[in-house]
Amino acid sequence: MPVSTSGFDAPARLGTLLTAMATPFKPDGSLDIETAARLATRLVDAGCDGLVVSGTTGESPTTTDDEKILLLRTVLEAVGDRARIVAGAGTYDTAHSIHLAKASAAEGAHGLLVVTPYYSRPPQAGLVAHFTAVADATDLPNILYDIPPRSVVPIEWDTIRRLAQHPNIVAIKDAKADLHGGGQIIAETGLAYYSGDDALNLPWLAMGAVGFISVWGHLAASQLRDMLSAFASGDVATARKINVALGPLSAAQSRLGGVTLSKAGLRLQGFEVGDPRLPQIPANDVQLQALAADMRAASVLR
């Protein structure tokens, strides 16, 4: 089996703890650039060595192309060389995805996150053509985002094996939760794997993943960094302890979803990023109370 990415240093080029950054909005719903810069700095200060801008948690379906590029520019300027910045470039339209990829590369992004085309449910041959076209559009490393709960269509293992031969396709963000299959792909292809489901962060490390692309990083970046460090040093017991301690956040995310969890959780921690854009909605008072209880149980809120 070809090993297309054996020489690619994903931790150095893309990071190991990347938070899929929420996009701050002002009360009138417009993009809040000043808060975006402060949020990016806050996350890097807390232990993130990478950020994803304009991903799912960043409400990419509801932001314009101009807003995406302005947000990317703002985050790059805010964190400088302290973290790797990955731009969300995936849509259900190949031409539009290529446009976003080129614009992100021109702005200075360090990598691209390209989600499986959603809604249109393309066949596997269509996925190969789509991901290849986006990967061909720039010289940036591409992370493919495999998330069947949102896209319906998974990236099948044989499709990943084919795509792994492309020099710019270097990593997978996995929200498919097939640990055994993913472990086989890691061994066969050399692709870097990132956990895309915080509840499975530690199991993915055991299968050979290099890190996380996280929602919980908004609220628990220092704990996730400690878990990564403990696992890397062979202290699995400490990594397990941290993983269990963060468990209440899983229940909260199941109730609220990643966007609302991130924004409501930051609000509870005293960092205001505004409400989501419709069709996402903010947490109500009852939900905030339940979230606060979960965050206290996870030791991420006093």
Curated annotation (Swiss-Prot):
Pathway(s) this gene product operates in, as recorded in its UniProt entry: Amino-acid biosynthesis; L-lysine biosynthesis via DAP pathway; (S)-tetrahydrodipicolinate from L-aspartate: step 3/4
Site residues, Part of a proton relay during catalysis: T56, Y119
Protein name: 4-hydroxy-tetrahydrodipicolinate synthase
Any GO molecular function: 4-hydroxy-tetrahydrodipicolinate synthase activity
Top-level EC class as recorded in UniProt: lyase
A Pfam family: DHDPS
GO cellular component, one term: cytosol
Keyword Membrane: no
Presence of the UniProt keyword DNA repair in the record: no
Main location: cytoplasm
Function summary: Catalyzes the condensation of (S)-aspartate-beta-semialdehyde [(S)-ASA] and pyruvate to 4-hydroxy-tetrahydrodipicolinate (HTPA).
Subunit structure of this chain's protein: Homotetramer; dimer of dimers.
Stored CDD domains: DHDPS
Binding sites annotated in the UniProt record for pyruvate: T57, I213
Reaction(s) the record says it catalyses: L-aspartate 4-semialdehyde + pyruvate = (2S,4S)-4-hydroxy-2,3,4,5-tetrahydrodipicolinate + H2O + H(+)
Gene3D superfamilies per UniProt: Aldolase class I
Active site location: Y145, K173
Family membership: Belongs to the DapA family.
Cell compartment(s), UniProt: Cytoplasm
Keywords: Amino-acid biosynthesis, Cytoplasm, Diaminopimelate biosynthesis, Lyase, Lysine biosynthesis, Schiff base
EC numbers for this chain: 4.3.3.7
